[in-house]
UniProtKB/Swiss-Prot annotation:
This is Glycerol kinase. Key enzyme in the regulation of glycerol uptake and metabolism. Catalyzes the phosphorylation of glycerol to yield sn-glycerol 3-phosphate. It comes from Aliivibrio salmonicida (strain LFI1238) (Vibrio salmonicida (strain LFI1238)). The gene is glpK. Its EC number is 2.7.1.30. GO terms for cellular component: cytosol. ADP binds at residues 14, 18, 268, 311, 412, 416.
Length: 504
């Protein structure tokens, strides 16, 4: 009998590093997690220590193997998934970062973005990278490091510095500096990668004064990039065989590999991705065009929309409004009333994301009457997550011309049955909740396992993607449209607040 083999997924997130071990049936055998330091040098700036990212990630790998009693020679391959856009620049001779990692949330490069807009590059960037000009993405962060760290620009010109998103940094460290690589999904979040030619965009690199020599080689999301020796000296060499940015890994983990398949991750915010296959769809409705994974981990296209306030709006009910003791109680209180009684909550606390992109909108509660109680507000806040999701899905359908047949869901809020049912009702499509909700890690593991032949193909994996529950839509069409029109009116109120202020 052959000895059992496993796949390891390294899930490097914004607040913690995790390692997940899966067996051949795609069951999770062991998980280990370590949080790391969030650094806020000044308002709007967010950093991580790249060495701490690597230290926490490598220690979770060792811990999770020890916890499960699995030897390193039983690992068939390692897959990596990571927080996207976060930017690291290091010296390839010393292996030391020249500055902290600048995190995706960091807004310090807003001025550089304004200059790109003034230079008339907005349309070029949208057409060739699929993105909007925003400090969120890596390109302007690289420029900031080269412009502000002493000696960095000279070293970069001399070919001594390397750039990487978190996946690139981890692979470089795990292969002792032998491999400088990223995958298409992570490259597509830098704002300097051309998604038409699948090459670094030399015009944008020149505009931002970034030497091409710094940039990693870009490969598919499922192939052997290099090997790592996790047992130390004389230990086993294990192939690193899968890489994908966290949202694209979740899309793959949900088996959304064909045109028109979509998933929504309900976290602090919501991330919706729809696979558009080989067809690049340029959004006219405020969505991003990005790269995802095709059936074999090759580059395919996707539309992406982000909702800023998902689970965070429930935390607001708990922490600021004191209407809940525990976020999990929201379902119980929401079902204590038959409807939201005409109340709408628009949680635009930091403006509105896709498809509105309105930084000046503010949180609003409308439709209050004397009969409104706390349960109506709790229910309306949960409903707002579903309405915002519909806003993005409608934009995706308009851009792609593809009618959604079902929505696959993951993330913390999917445990809320009321929200999932209301989501199905609002969209008029079935909502599928998987049994294993660790879909980001699953995606990275699937990509690595397929690359080394651990799994035969997608057909074999599809049989392992068990749905825990499907929520079928119940509302009649008149009621659905009436409620959604009410939501649209409420959004207009949230957007009008700043306009009214300007008129004073």
């Amino acid at each position: 009998m052959t000895e059992q083999k496993y796949i390891v997924a390294l899930d490097q997130g914004t607040t913690s590093s995790r390692a997940v071990i899966l067996d051949h049936d795609a069951n999770i055998v062991s998980v280990s997690q370590r949080e790391f330091t969030q650094i806020y040098p000044q308002a709007g700036w967010v950093e991580h220590d790249p060495l701490e990212i690597y230290a926490t990630q490598s220690s979770t790998l060792v811990e999770t193997l020890a916890k499960a009693g699995i030897r390193s020679d039983q690992i068939a391959a390692i897959g990596i998934t990571n927080q996207r856009e976060t930017t690291i620049v290091w010296n390839k001779e010393t292996g030391k970062p020249v500055y902290n990692a600048i995190v995706w949330q960091c807004r310090r490069t807003a001025d550089t973005c304004e200059k790109l807009k003034e230079a008339g590059l907005e349309e070029y960037i949208r057409e060739n990278t699929g993105l909007v000009v925003d400090p969120y993405f890596s390109g302007t962060k690289i420029k900031w490091i080269l412009d502000n760290v002493e000696g960095a620009r000279e070293d970069a010109e001399a070919g001594k510095l390397l750039f990487g998103t978190v996946d690139t940094w981890l692979v470089w460290k795990m292969t002792q500096g032998r491999v400088h690589v990223t995958d298409y999904t992570n490259a597509s979040r830098t704002m300097v990668f051309n998604i038409n030619t699948l090459q670094w965009d030399e015009k944008l690199l020149k505009e931002l004064d970034i030497p091409l020599s710094m940039m990693p080689e870009v490969k598919s999301s499922s192939e052997v990039y290099g090997e790592t020796n996790i047992g130390g000296k004389g230990g086993t060499r294990i192939p690193i065989a899968g890489i994908a940015g966290d949202q694209q890994a979740a899309l793959y983990g949900q088996m959304c590999v064909e045109q028109g398949q979509a998933k929504n991750t309900y976290g602090t915010g919501c991330f919706l991705l729809m696979n558009t296959g080989k067809e690049k769809v340029t959004s006219r409705n405020g969505l991003l065009t990005t790269l995802a994974c095709g059936p074999r981990g090759e580059a395919s296209y996707a539309l992406e929309g982000a909702v800023f306030m998902g689970g965070a709006s429930i935390q607001w009910l708990r922490d600021e409004m004191k209407l809940l003791a525990d976020a999990k109680d929201s379902e119980y209180f929401a079902t204590k009333v038959d409807s939201s009684n005409g109340v709408y909550v628009v949680p635009a606390f930091t403006g509105l994301g896709a498809p509105y992109w309105d930084a000046y909108a503010r949180g609003t509660i409308v439709g209050l009457t004397r009969g409104c109680g706390s349960n109506h507000i709790i229910r309306a806040t949960l409903e707002s997550i579903a309405y915002q999701t519909r806003d993005v899905i409608d934009a995706m359908q308009a851009d792609s011309g593809i009618k959604l047949s079902a929505l696959r869901v993951d993330g913390g809020a999917v445990a809320n049955n009321f929200l999932m049912q209301f989501q199905a009702d609002v969209l008029d499509v079935a909502v599928h909740r998987p049994q294993v909700t660790e879909v980001t890690a699953l995606g990275a593991a699937y990509l690595a396992g397929l690359a080394v032949g651990f799994w035969g193909g997608l057909d074999e994996l599809a049989g392992k993607a068990v749905i825990d529950r499907s929520f079928e839509p119940h509302h009649d069409e008149i009621k659905r449209n009436q409620r959604y029109r009410g939501w649209k009116r409420a959004v207009k109120c949230a957007q009008s607040w700043a306009e009214l202020h300007d008129e004073e």
